[in-house]
A protein has these predicted regions:
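Bacterial Sec-dependent N-terminal signal peptides
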Residues: 1-26
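N-terminal amphipathic/hydrophobic interface segments
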Residues: 21-143
């Protein structure tokens, strides 16, 4: 039991101090920062290889190169460089783009996101509502 607790503590600290894979403007490897994780668990049966972060009153938050995401539950796959966010998800890029939904899958390697369930995208004066939306940060396109 003691080794398990040590492993979980190490994993928790590791996730808060490191980043997932992605490319920055210099072509160097970068990682997604877990800003706040709340409660965390590991469930290798349901989410093999993932760390699960759950709100503890304060929302789970992660950040990647000018993109912030808040949610109630985040499933972090370090090997796949992917975060899946569930429950009242808010994606904010800079001060102009905001997307709300119930689910977002964000891939750091490709800087792409898929949002589902009650998606509302706001960019300046434009508002788009749909049930599914793909967002490519490299091209700054949503479709």
């Amino acid at each position: 039991m003691k080794h398990r607790d040590t492993y979980i503590l190490f994993l928790f600290l590791f996730n808060f101090c490191t980043y997932l894979w992605s490319q920055d403007s210099n072509g160097k490897t970068r990682r997604i920062e877990i800003v706040y994780g709340g409660e965390f668990t590991i469930d290798n049966v349901k989410y093999p290889g993932a760390t699960i972060f759950k709100s503890d009153g304060q929302r789970v938050q992660f950040r990647h190169q000018g993109l912030d995401v808040w949610c109630d539950l985040a499933v972090l796959y370090e090997e796949r460089n992917e975060v899946i966010a569930h429950g009242k998800v808010v994606l904010q890029q800079g001060d102009t783009l905001q997307m709300n939904s119930q689910y977002i899958s964000y891939k750091g390697n490709t800087k792409t996101a898929v949002a589902r369930e009650g998606v509302v995208l706001r960019n300046g004066n434009m508002t788009l509502e749909t049930e599914e939306l793909f967002f490519d940060r490299n091209k700054q396109e949503a479709y």
